[in-house]
């Protein structure tokens, strides 16, 4: 399920940037805007489902005495929810022709923070390199 989660958020980031850039302030939406936005929502939903599944698995492992990064996992979950919310807000503001650059950059910064937290979690590459679990 971890690979599904990683694949879904990578595709969601690519689709977010493509959707955001396919709406012009002068010409409006391109013909690709609506399918891209719907695919983005599909991958955001898949990211949410797989992320919650991973969170539940980690909490169940902790109840058996195996895990213990609840605070970091909860922080990553909150950052992930904020990323998805800011993705939708920035696209909606761009569609309404309001200033959306601030929300776009907030989303990019939150994506980087969420990815950094994910990298240092027990299933992340840094933990595997140094044998931290």
Swiss-Prot record:
Keyword terms of this UniProt record: Cell membrane, Membrane, Transmembrane, Transmembrane helix
UniProt cross-references to InterPro entries, sorted A to Z: UPF0344
Q: What intrachain disulfides are recorded?
A: none
The way this protein sits in the membrane is described as: Multi-pass membrane protein
Recorded GO cellular component terms are: plasma membrane
**Transmembrane spans:** 1-21, 42-62, 71-91, 103-123
Q: Where in the cell is it found?
A: Cell membrane
Q: Give the similarity note.
A: Belongs to the UPF0344 family.
Q: What is this protein called?
A: UPF0344 protein SERP0557
The organism encoding this protein is Staphylococcus epidermidis (strain ATCC 35984 / DSM 28319 / BCRC 17069 / CCUG 31568 / BM 3577 / RP62A)
Taxon lineage: Bacteria, Bacillati, Bacillota, Bacilli, Bacillales
């Amino acid at each position: 399920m971890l690979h599904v989660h990683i694949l879904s958020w990578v595709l969601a980031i690519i689709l977010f940037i493509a959707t955001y850039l396919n709406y012009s302030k002068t010409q409006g939406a391109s013909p690709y805007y609506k399918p891209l936005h719907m695919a983005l929502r599909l991958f955001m939903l898949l990211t949410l489902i797989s992320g919650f599944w991973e969170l539940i698995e980690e909490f169940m492992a902790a109840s058996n005495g195996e895990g213990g990064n609840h605070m970091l996992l909860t922080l990553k979950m909150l950052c992930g929810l904020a990323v998805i919310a800011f993705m939708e807000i920035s696209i909606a503001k761009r569609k309404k022709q309001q200033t959306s650059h601030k929300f776009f950059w907030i989303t990019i910064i939150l994506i980087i923070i969420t990815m950094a937290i994910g990298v240092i979690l027990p299933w992340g590459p840094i933990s595997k390199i140094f044998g931290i679990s």
